Amino acid sequence: MDNNIKKKKFAKREYIYRKRIPYGMMNFVTVRRDDCYYVDKTSYIEEIERSNKFFFYIRPRRFGKSLTLSMLKQYYDINMADRFEELFGGLYIGENPTPEHNTYLIISLNFAVVDANLENYKKGLDAHCNTEFNYFCDVYAQYLPVDIKEEMNRKDGAAEQLDYLCKECKKTGQKVYLFIDEYDHFTNTILAEPDCLNSYQAETHGTGYLRKFFDTIKSATDSTLERVFVTGVSPVTMDDLASGFNIGTNYSLSYEFNEMAGFTEEDVREMLTYYTDTLNLHNYTVDELIELMKPWYDNYCFAKASYGETTMYNSNMVLYFIDNYIRNRGRLPENMIEENIRLDYNKLRMLIRKDKEFAHDASIIQQLVENGFVAGELKTGFPAEQIGDPDNFVSLLYYFGMVTIAGTHQGKTKFVIPNEVVREQLFRYLLDTYKENDLKYDSYEKGKLESALAYCGEWKPYFEYIADSLHKYSSQRDRQKGEYFVHGFTLAMTCDNKFYRPISEKDTQEGYADIFLCPLVDNFSDMLHSYIVELKYAKSKDTDAHVEQLRQDAIRQVIRYAESEVVTSAIKTTQLHKIIVVYKGTEMVICEEVE
């Protein structure tokens, strides 16, 4: 019996070969060596070569920029010529190589590893560049003067060392391609700590050290620096360095490069089809999986001319979902959001802090919450000291991936929150800021109320809990914001509910619903209840007759919204509850269900 048990326990599991998912991978050589699924972006090499030689490209975090940079480095590296077929065979550029492939010496810098503290920035930049410059001398020794490494190390600092290397390469007739990833890394410190602004300006203007480094890059273009490719998440630093690096071209908003980072829906469909067919995972059709993923990961647009043609999925989010879907053997991830995708906390803290500097009727965040969109001019760049300008602020939100292009409104660019991952980040942060300002609640008690809401249809205690928290927390400043604050606070609290995807101002055929608690039935198949909430606000001094009029308006509206096709299809097997809530000041005076 023991032997049988052992045989059963250690029986080899059947394995179906499939391509690995390159989740979190940024090294192109590793992706190809390990036979990972690679969405082919190599056709953009032709577009890049047709562009100006000093290429500036920014995208939000986790959009595949670093992997694209890695691919470009392997394509152009003279030392990788004998591996061209291994790395690029079967890809577009492998079948259509350009004359420039494998003809460059590569200098690769990643400012993400440099200490972002301005007090240590010069030391960190020098150390990182020195490491990379020494590596450059070692791997390309056969193409360089014999004593170049020793002489380079005698030079003082990154700028002088780079200048020396480029001049020596010119003597030997070698071309150099410079890649800089996360060039704006230390800008994060400035955004999170505005007190550092003076030090930042000193570094990026006049005789500042970073300015000197980019001046060196500019001067090297007259010698051997043939191409430069720079990536980051914000145009702020480059704008401040512009007069020092005014030969670069910003292609971040260009139509032809809209799809270079991230995945198109066609890319996602092909990937899903490959894995579902290869592994025989047919719990959901590809169409059903797309329908599930789209609200969470899609809807980015990086060029005005691309609006209405195609939208982009965040590639990291897609890979996270598919990786979990496979490992769970065809079951959906319990959490649609991977922790590492969340925006850097301090960066988002800065955004909200800057937003609070606006008057309440001009607040960008409040407009997003109340209207579902904001309108403004999309700036290609702006200096750090002008982040507080409304158009600059909404542009910064755009570059960070917090809003995306959604057409035009009254002659300006229209921006919306792109998807539920971003919405969750934004409202969770708002909830955290409330907590930091003395909002206190029992998470265990709140969790019980959320479960009762989803499984027992006990809605009144849940909304009373939100109202009680709102009343206790609200300050005089918040009371002045009135409806904006009440709506935003309610949304933030409902966004912290794992059973629902709260949709604000859901556009239905008949109009707009304040909050639709869209049930995540695919994640919680046994949940029973969903909710559509019409929220009305009266000032403290308004009459009871006015409050009653708001109540009647809410009843008519919630009935109409609940019958829309969008809502009826989303609730699936759950029972829909039509709830109206009326606040008078910060007091909830009506909370009832409409039959």
What is each of the regions a protein language model found here?
Residues 6-77, 85-94:
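Walker A/P-loop-proximal flanking segment of P-loop NTPase domains
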Residues 23-26, 108-158, 186-201:
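Conserved P-loop NTPase mechanochemical-coupling segment
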Residues 40, 74-138:
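P-loop NTPase motor core
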Residues 164-171, 199-226:
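Substrate-engagement module of ASCE P-loop NTPases
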Residues 179-181, 211-212, 226-233:
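Structural recognition of the conserved hydrophobic beta-strand(s) that form the central parallel beta-sheet
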Residues 237-244, 251-323, 368:
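Amphipathic alpha-helical segments of the small helical/lid subdomains adjacent to P-loop NTPase cores
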Residues 248, 308-554, 560-562, 592-595:
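Extended alpha-helical interface modules used as scaffolds for assembling large macromolecular complexes
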Residues 547-555, 559-592:
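Nucleic-acid nuclease catalytic cores
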